[in-house]
Amino acid sequence: WNRNPEYYTESDWRGTLDKEGGSALENQAIHTFDLMQWLTVPIKTVEASCSTKRHKGVIETEDTCDVFMTGPNGERLVFFCTNCYVKNAPVELEIVCENGSIRMVGNLVTTELDGKTETKDFSSGTVFGKDYWGSGHGFLIEDYYTRLAAGERFPVSGEEAIVSTRLLHAVYSSAKNHEVIRL
């Protein structure tokens, strides 16, 4: 995405270590990062680099982060996020497997399996906030209230949710200490 310096200076918490903790990854790309780990294999190693490229002297946190991860059988996962892009483009996530792939760009999901390609639009029609955030927030909010009213369990438990938090901590630790983190 594109975050200009004013985005950070107009708030007392954005871009600060003690109040925000992180910027490009922890604040902007966290839902995509969470989705990536949820859709793929358990992460076993993390090697990351986080830096401030465009917003030097403006923020204490990162505006760019790249992460190389491996799974239990040597699967490779690469994640990149930045707030230095020239526009607020839709989120992109691609998972390439032995026999097929899934590619998400915004609300469009394209699957390829056995030489057949199918694209589905998962737009909910309800967008909370900016359109490049996607419509996932609308789905989640609606599902939350529906399940709450019905007394149903939520699809993700606290134990499952902590996986992304631990992974996020490993990314920042790897970037800070310039080392591979084993999970």
Regions found by a protein language model. Give the residues of each.
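Phosphate/oxyanion-binding loops and surfaces in catalytic or ligand/nucleic-acid-binding neighborhoods
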Residues: 42-43, 98-102, 171-174
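C-terminal helix-rich "cap/oligomerization" subdomain common to oxidoreductases
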Residues: 72, 143-183
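Active-site rim elements
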Residues: 21-23, 128-132, 150-154
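Predominantly a Rossmann-like dinucleotide-binding segment in NAD(P)-dependent oxidoreductases
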Residues: 1-58, 178
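NAD(P)-dinucleotide binding in Rossmann-like oxidoreductases
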Residues: 53-62, 72-139, 157
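A generic structural signal for residues located within well-ordered alpha-helices
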Residues: 28-31, 136, 159, 163
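A general structural signal for well-ordered alpha-helical segments in protein cores
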Residues: 32-33, 137-142, 168-169
